Amino acid sequence: MTSCSKCGMIPSLEETGTFLFTAAEAGGRDLIIKHLKDRGAEPEQEGRTIHVPFYSLEEAVRMVDGLEADLKESGVSVKGTWKNSASVFGHMLDLAVLKVRISKPSYLKIINEGLFTHHMQPIINLHSSEVMGQEFLMRPDSSTYSFYPGELFDYAQKADLQSVLDSQARMSSIEHSARHLDQGTKRFINFLPSSIYDPNHCLKSTFKVVKEHGVDPSDLVFEVVETEKIHNVAHLQNIFKTYQQYGVNVALDDLGSGFATVEMLEQLKPDYGKVDRSLISYCDQDEEKQEKLKQMLKRAEIHNIKMLAEGIERKEELEVVKQLGFDLAQGYYIGRPSDYPMGKSFTTAGK
């Protein structure tokens, strides 16, 4: 378990702690105490707050959930937070978050124990056809605890565990890359900017793992993955700056899709820009897409940003992006994600 209260002391379902209840009305607090005692709990009141020690988080949430339903009929609104007794900092979680956490015990266990691995998808240099890097993609490490990465991150976000999962996935990717890749091979690793509230603090553990595993920082490329609008560009610029101060490269993913615009590319000035598949798919048959790609490449060239075409699934797409002047490419036509890295070069023979 991590020791940072923001990135997540993660209470397990068996962890002991105290639930803190509040109600606006004095009569409401009396009613809460009565209901808790009727359920076998031993509440203690301190001002407007009612403290109830529990043997486990799971027990607490199930009792509070039932209590909430009972009191709703009396018109009393209950607010509850959990404080886990094992935390050095004390970790406060509201009832809604706790309900999410116990809704999928297997997901909580996966995050708590890091029960996942990574597959690698090759990225080629279009000028030399050599494999210059691998993107790391989270996958289950066993059939016992299976998950879809998107669903796991969605659960983590609702359960207030997104920072924990993002940090674990980032560090695990670095460790995995140290075992499988030679020095000089770029390692493209996703990160969620919303999970990093203070770059200098939150990224210490990442840089520690880099050093421990002897990974050259210049071989790392951390790429922004964000499904929601970036409201604080200055914060993201600060994250990029922190990475680059340590010699790490940065990339902006999904260009041309959603909020990852060319204007954002020019504001952030990453080392790499990854163009979304929506612009690459059948670009050989779409002159409008080709024109958009040309303009994107021109503006990237001004800032010396290397451009990567994602989602290449056909030979014709590969040929077009190469002719247009893309530096790099990635996709199923080149190579699918795998446990082990693809060979050092790419050939179209037999494709």
Give residue ranges: language-model regions.
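Structural preference for beta-strand elements that scaffold enzyme active sites
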Residues: 117, 135, 186-188, 219-223, ...
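Surface-exposed amphipathic alpha-helices with a cationic face
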Residues: 210-211, 237-249, 294-301, 322
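Glycine-rich beta-to-alpha transition loops that act as phosphate-gripper elements at the mouths
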Residues: 123, 253-259, 306-315
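Conserved, mostly hydrophobic/aromatic
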Residues: 129, 169, 173, 189, ...
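Catalytic-site-adjacent helices and loops of nucleotide signaling machinery
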Residues: 149, 158, 252-265, 318
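Catalytic core of bacterial c-di-GMP phosphodiesterases, primarily the EAL and HD-GYP domains
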Residues: 163-235
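Active-site core of bacterial EAL-family cyclic-dinucleotide phosphodiesterase domains
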Residues: 95-154, 337-338
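EAL-family c-di-GMP phosphodiesterase catalytic domain
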Residues: 1-90, 94-99, 130, 226-229, ...
